[in-house]
Regions:
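Core SAM-dependent methyltransferase catalytic element
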Residues: 190-212
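Class I S-adenosylmethionine-dependent transferase superfamily signal
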Residues: 61, 133-134
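Short glycine-dipeptide loop
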Residues: 138-144
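Conserved class I S-adenosyl-L-methionine
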Residues: 1-42, 56, 152
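A conserved beta-strand element that flanks and buttresses the S-adenosyl-L-methionine
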Residues: 112-115
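C-terminal alpha-helical "lid/dimerization" subdomain adjacent to the S-adenosyl-L-methionine
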Residues: 145-196
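A short, conserved alpha-helix within the catalytic core of class I
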Residues: 120-133
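Class I SAM-dependent methyltransferase SAM/SAH-binding core
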Residues: 46-101
């Protein structure tokens, strides 16, 4: 998808202070510490991270050294950056697009789609393919968790609306049709139980028991 090309080596170097330190906290009004807590709450021993960005959240997830973790992204720069950061873990890096069948073997106990859905090509019915693809590689009791920035129907400030419009014009986001209700529907199509809440302009979710 178009937005992933923005993740250059230089951008990844400034990602944590710029995106997590400023945009997430100030523009989207969602505390980064809360997102770290959700990682710690939901992550399990056999974990798949789709769109790991810099590895910031995995680094803080409380996993013991040597824990096997699979990271998946279409951008090799992301995979390289996160792999270097997470050397204390047993990382398997997979270059792949979540909107296509995942080239993975075995099943996972948990998976994260953090900050990914608002970047995927819309509408939400099209993004549902990525959710279904992840659900297909989860164990029967597995959990998918993450967060996504809502479209204009979400609770936005003047500043966040300006940034939402700018990111969609540039093709970094594709979420003008993303609603909390719609997100709940695509999660519910692939999972039996869905928890969904809004913090600032972001929807935070956890979905368990993938449908077979």
């Amino acid at each position: 998808y178009r937005g992933q090309s923005e993740y250059t080596p230089f951008f990844l170097k400034i990602y944590d202070p710029l995106i997590l330190g400023f945009f997430t906290r100030v523009v989207w009004r969602c505390p980064t510490d809360l997102l770290v807590e959700r990682y710690r709450r939901h992550i399990r021993p056999r974990h798949l991270d789709v769109g790991p960005d810099t590895g910031y959240f995995l680094e803080r997830a409380g996993l013991p050294a040597g824990t096997p973790v699979t990271i998946l992204d279409p951008n090799v720069h992301v995979l390289d950056h996160a792999s270097r950061r997470l050397q204390r873990l047993d990382i398997t890096a997979v270059e792949a697009d979540a909107c296509k069948p995942l080239p993975l073997h075995g099943t996972f106990d948990s998976a994260a789609l953090h900050g990914v859905i608002h970047c995927l090509p819309g509408p939400l019915s099209r993004k549902a393919v990525a959710v279904a693809n992840v659900a297909a590689v989860l164990a029967p009791t597995g959990v998918l968790f993450g967060a996504s920035i809502l479209g204009p129907s979400g609770p936005h400030t003047w500043l966040s609306r300006k940034m939402l419009d700018a990111n969609n014009r540039r093709g970094i986001f594709d979420n003008l049709g993303d609603t909390q209700e719609g997100l709940g529907e695509i999660l519910g199509a692939s999972f039996e139980h869905v928890e969904l809440e809004t913090v600032g302009s972001m929807a935070i979710f956890a979905a368990t028991n993938p449908r077979t």
